[in-house]
Amino acid sequence: MRKTIVSTVKLLLCVAVLFTVGSYASDWRLLGPEGGDVRSLSYDPADPNHILLGTSAGQLFVSQDGGNSWALFAHLGAGDDYVLDHIIFDPTHTATLYVAGWSLYNKEEGDVLRSDDGGHTWRALPAVHGKSVRALAMAPSDHNTLVIGALDGVFRSRDGGATWERISPENYAEIKNIESVAIDPENPDVIYAGTFHLPWKTEDGGQSWHSIQQGMLLDSDVFSIIVDPSRPTTVFLSACSGIYKSVNAGTLFSRIRGIPHSAIRTRVLKQDPKRPGIVYAGTTGGLWKTFDGGNTWELYSAPDVIVNDILIDPRQPERVLLATDRGGVLASDDGFDHYLSSNRGFSHRVIGGVIVDHQDPSRLYVGVVNDKDRGGFFFSEDGGQSWRQSNRGLDERDILSLQQADSGVIFAGTNHGIFYLPSFQGAWLPAAMILGKRPPESENVAAPASPRSKAAHSSTKAGSKRKPVTHVPKAPLEVAIATAKAPRVRSLQIADKVWYAATDQGLFTSVDQGSKWYGEPVEGESDFIVVNHFADGSLTLVSPKHIFLSHDEGESWTEISYPQYVTGLYNLTVVPDGSLWLGTREGALHSTDGGKTWQHLLGGLPPRNVFAVYYDAAGQRLLATALFAHGVFASKDGGRSWQRTGDAGVSIRSAMNYRGRLLAASAYNGLLLEQSSVVVESAADGAHAGERTPSASQR
């Protein structure tokens, strides 16, 4: 039944790729906002203060102080899509580490990665390269024995990952889609495997398997399995139908009562290393705890906490860390009677928009995607050193774009409409959005008031033609589109007379400073990604397949053609010399004749997936960002040659000049600030950073 997987020299050369730890801290600093998704936690048995944290974007963070603070440590995988659900230190030689990863986007991609130098370099183990590894365990009695659960079965290594053998029946319909594995603490041939359907067990290293579903509800997705090290016949497992316990090594399971249906998806179980009667259950409905081996349970966190992993300090079991969705790391020193966020230095946030305050550049505003009530809008009054959340009224909406009016009012384009913030202590209010052509009307109407004091914004910016603030409308007078069905507003631009919003229901415009917006298609196209307004009055509008250019504030549009080999559009920029820069899936394209002809430029730029080219007026240069580039590209010669900044360790979606440095919105790690000064101080306009793809909870 077992089949050995041979690691040939050719395969070794192809896939045993080294993933190195960059000197990220010397080039860039993560500003936050802190928090976000954490997938896994693991401590060093020789020094439990040394903890590694895994994310759903292939990153490892490290803590040297027991989880009180974090630093970006390593990036694993070729892209940003590896979900790192399992991290194991070899107890006999803790510089040896194993990490299991699976691709968020491709079921045919995944790895087990090994480091022999404490995580400074990594290599993918070639024999299991390409497997979507969802579970990883090390035998407590033999640390050279590793077992992985993948979508195509169960595999074992008895030499620290050098070679692997399949120990589940090949092409067997039931023992596949493995989500959890556990190894008996005394006998490494006794292995439990949980599938998307039910649990299985082998007692002879995979020679034979038998179902251990007796006592369980059918079609139970098995998330986690633990075996009591002090009494191996006691087995706990969690499934979508609840938590089960067996006292006879899986022959019969009993469903544990006491945890409500709302928390029934228990993603992880962990047992107190000193008191085996204490078991923690990390669920989608909070952290639950039992003191009597599962007979009774109590909720020990807020019920909306989604727990992905649990770490218990072996020296002091009352010290517990949780890896959570959206909330980052939660930490407790008293068994979770009390707990606090512990995210200093850790950010796994998808930035939808970032702007610098027009009058006070130490004030930064950020909108995030995918974090629901723990996301929304954040602001900093000290240049990103600390952040506060202000999302009341957003109702868990994602913020895809941000802009600030001259009055100081913040406007947010969300996944359901446009909102504005009259006061940081108040609630966000929806702007009226109406499908149809904008009727002729006066432009001299009151705008929403500033979220700061009227005195601070009693006059407009120098050179502005807009009127000062007079009052705050109590509510929109007309809402033709129901708020729940409001368009997805991917990009906002504020110009002198007309404001613009690129949405999935057309281009919306406002002439009353954001109180009311009218939207309609442009040249028959309704689904737009981004709109840009430039100093010369020109506008660019980009949809997934079309690009448009206007030189008269959007009164008329010209569709710009582009090469047929281009399969995806990201952004179109007009630079001061009048030339066009197009960011595409096939790289950066440049046109000097209004889009009649295009040149695919490299000169140091990546050949594919250039998000956008920006003009940095303060630095008198072009900036560009690209997928997986882990930095920002700059050109001082009009785009003929490009140099990349220092390694950020993470993918960057957009960048701006901020006080002489680059302020960048990363793909998954919040804001980053370049450490070295490069140009004169400048408060830049807002940057649009894009949207997130599926969450790691999706299989």
What are the functions of these language-model segments?
Residues 4-15, 22-699:
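Extracellular glycan-interacting surfaces
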